[in-house]
């Protein structure tokens, strides 16, 4: 079980995973892991689960077996989980790991372009729409963005289109807390994403 620490995080698959007689191993960096795995490797102080996987591979003595493709996957996970190394990334060991991944022949600049600079036109227009309706609460150093089911339909929303939206308000000077409310397109529920910086 990678990068999730509670069965409820995997929605419909939770019952299947819970009922599976297979041995379960959790590798994760989120706080308060649930006790549903035989082995739990949980380190919230680590920046990403991908970094944790890399450390585990090296601890077991298999660094030489990491392929270029494997190194690309690890780097991509580290990069996306830290917002392009803009938060939770002050540990100097992260950059030692990156240098080790570079030794496998990865092109980190190309990976960045493919992850962050290949969006569809509709996603970009959706982002503009969401930001144009953003509400900033200056007295609280906070911002709120939202997206209804109807609005998603208007912009031909596909799963993942709003990934990272919650981080954008944090680029506003003095905004330390961001909340993103998105109406689910399949279930009668609203998904809430929260982000903060500093000591908010």
What is each residue range found by the language model?
Residues 16-19, 33-34, 66-68, 77, ...:
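Solvent-exposed alpha-helices and their adjacent loops that cap or buttress functional pockets
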Residues 23-27, 39-42, 143, 179-181:
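Hydrophobic/aromatic beta-strand patches that form the interior of the parallel beta-sheet core
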Residues 13-17, 39-42, 92-93, 194-195:
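Short, glycine/charged-enriched secondary-structure capping and boundary segments
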Residues 1-39:
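Active-site cofactor/cluster-binding pocket
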Residues 2-5, 27-30, 56, 82, ...:
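Fold-independent oxyanion-binding glycine-rich loops
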Residues 29-97:
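Short alpha-helices
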Residues 1-3, 28, 77, 145-148, ...:
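Short beta-strand segments
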Residues 82-200:
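Hydrophobic helix-and-loop "lid/oligomerization" segment in the mid-to-C-terminal part
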